[in-house]
Regions:
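An N-terminal domain-start capping segment
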Residues: 1-33, 107, 124-127, 134-140, ...
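Short beta-edge/loop segments at beta->alpha junctions of small alpha/beta modules
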Residues: 1-75, 171-184, 188
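Short gly/ser-rich loop at a beta-strand->alpha-helix junction or flexible surface loop bordering the NTP-binding
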Residues: 16, 35-36, 40-58, 62-124, ...
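A residue-level signal for conserved active-site and pocket-lining positions in enzyme catalytic cores
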Residues: 19, 83, 145
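Generic structural signal for bulky hydrophobic/aromatic residues embedded
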Residues: 22, 86-87, 148, 195
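Hydrophobic/aromatic-lined pockets within catalytic cores
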Residues: 24, 38, 88, 150-153, ...
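Short amphipathic alpha-helical segments with coiled-coil-like heptad repeat character
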Residues: 27-28, 91, 153-157
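Hydrophobic alpha-helical interaction segments
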Residues: 129-254
Length: 254
C-alpha cells in the first residue's frame, strides 16, 4: 500500500486512465482501488473521473485551484483574472477559475470554487509552465494582460483590471507585439494602446508600441466597456470610455 500511495501522491491529480497507466501490473482493479482510497480518506473526487490526493495532516486536497484548473483537459490553461492572481497582480482573489481549453469540458464547482470553461479554437498564446510547478499551465503576464483587455468581463470588470495594472512594473514589449499580431484584432490593439498608455511611465511603455497600437487599432470608433458605462469619447484613441477614467484634457463629451 505504501508503494501505491507513493505513486498516487506523485501524480497528485489524475483521471482513472492516468492512474491505470501509472499502476500497470500493480493492481487488479483501478476502480476498486479508487473506491477504497476514497472511503479511507486518501482521495477526493473533484468531478466525474478526476481525483486529487488529500493532505494527511489537514485532510484537504493537495492541489490548489491552479493545479486543478490545469488538469481539466490536455490543453487546459489558467487564464484571465485567475492568471493575474497566479502572477501576483490581482487586486482581490476570486472564487472563479477561468480555464482556456481547446477541448471542451463542462464548467463545474468544487470546494466553493467555480471552474469556468473558456472556449479556445486556436493554440493558446503565451502558455507557460512555471519553474518549480510542473503541474500548472498558465498564460504569461503579457498574454494574460491582452486576454483581459480583450475580455474585460473576465478580468473582473474595468475597475478591477485597472487596480491589477497598478502592480505592473515591467512588460516584455517584444512579446506584446508578437501576441498582438497573432491575435490580429484591431479592437484589441485599440484597447491595448489606451490601457497601456495609462501606465506608460510606471511600466516604461515605449512610444513606438503606443504608436503601433494607434496605427493598427483606431480605424473605427469603439466602446471600451458597455455603451451605458462608456459615455466619454477619447479622441486620440477613437474610443468611448467611462468618464471617471479620463482627465479634462483628453476627452470630449458627445
Amino acid at each position: 500500500m505504501t508503494e501505491l500511495l507513493s505513486i498516487l501522491y506523485k501524480l497528485r491529480i489524475f483521471t482513472s486512465d492516468e492512474l491505470s497507466e501509472a499502476l500497470k501490473g500493480k493492481v487488479k482493479s483501478v476502480e476498486a482501488l479508487l473506491a477504497r482510497y476514497k472511503q479511507q480518506g486518501w482521495i477526493v473526487a473533484i468531478r466525474r473521473n478526476t481525483y486529487c490526493m488529500k493532505d494527511i495532516a489537514s485532510g484537504l486536497p493537495v492541489c490548489d485551484k491552479y493545479e486543478i484548473g490545469s488538469h481539466l483537459s490536455h490543453t487546459a490553461c489558467i487564464s484571465y483574472h485567475t492568471a493575474l492572481e497566479f502572477h501576483g497582480l490581482a487586486h482581490q482573489p476570486f472564487n472563479e477559475v477561468f480555464v482556456k481549453s481547446m477541448t471542451r469540458f463542462n464548467s463545474f464547482s468544487f470546494d466553493d470554487v467555480d471552474y469556468t470553461y473558456c472556449r479556445q479554437t486556436k493554440e493558446i498564446v503565451g502558455m507557460m509552465t512555471p519553474k518549480g510547478n510542473p503541474y500548472v499551465r498558465v498564460t504569461d503576464v503579457e498574454s494574460t494582460l491582452l486576454d483581459c483587455f480583450d475580455r474585460i468581463d473576465r478580468a473582473g470588470g474595468i475597475e478591477e483590471l485597472l487596480h491589477c495594472m497598478e502592480s505592473i512594473v515591467l512588460l516584455n514589449e517584444e512579446r506584446l507585439i508578437d501576441y498582438l499580431a497573432r491575435y490580429d484584432k484591431a479592437f484589441l490593439y485599440q484597447k491595448t494602446g489606451y490601457l497601456l498608455e495609462r501606465i506608460k511611465e510606471q511600466a516604461n511603455i515605449s512610444e513606438s508600441l503606443l504608436e503601433l497600437c494607434r496605427a493598427k487599432g483606431t480605424k473605427s470608433v469603439k466602446w471600451l466597456t458597455n455603451n451605458e458605462e462608456s459615455d466619454t469619447f477619447v479622441n486620440k484613441w477613437r474610443m468611448y470610455v467611462p468618464q471617471e477614467l479620463t482627465s479634462k484634457e483628453e476627452y470630449e463629451l458627445i
